[in-house]
Amino acid sequence: MCKLLLHLSCLICFTVMQHKYTVRLRSGFAELWRYNIVAECGGFDAAGERVCFVSAQSVIAPVGSALRQAPSEPTHPRAITMTTEPCESITAYIYVIPNTLPVSREVQDCLPFGLKVSVTADGETVYDVTHKVNQWGGASIELKLPAPAPQHAGEIRQL
């Protein structure tokens, strides 16, 4: 007696979802004037090809300026925002670069400060973290964020 086994094949189909990502950087650190902030962000399609590039910066003074006090223009608090074109995922690089080192040489006087990094995709928060920034060395932050999962992961079709 022979048995015939029937195998069902399924194909999962996903709708390609593109989102406008908004990256926001903010810090309330009183001495943030001692730092330049540079941010770059590439948006990628489902195949990993870059489809857009945005950047923003807030430069107070050239590196090595050794400023003795904050500039006369208000620099506190500082915020940077950049928004991509529609894309599947992003890779962002954030650099916090000292232009003036701390006056004190004592570690306890120069504790890390916070830089809040938040990312939304079409208004939905997908990343919200406060990073610690070393007062002497600054920070380099890399973010690789895929698009948020759709409400319905996909539909299953029988072949």
Where are these regions (language model features)?
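C-terminal partner/receptor-binding element of secreted or periplasmic proteins
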Residues: D128-L159
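Bacterial Sec-dependent N-terminal signal peptides
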Residues: M1-K20
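Surface-exposed loop/edge segments in extracytoplasmic proteins
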Residues: D45-V54, G64-Q69, G123-T130
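Short coil-to-beta strand junction motifs in C2/discoidin
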Residues: V107-L115
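Mature extracytoplasmic domains of secretory-pathway proteins
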Residues: S55-V107
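A short, structured loop/turn motif at beta-sheet edges
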Residues: T83-S89, V119-V126
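Short, surface-exposed binding/anchoring microloops in extracellular/periplasmic proteins
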Residues: M17-V54
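Beta-strand signatures of extracellular beta-sandwich domains
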Residues: N36, K116-T120
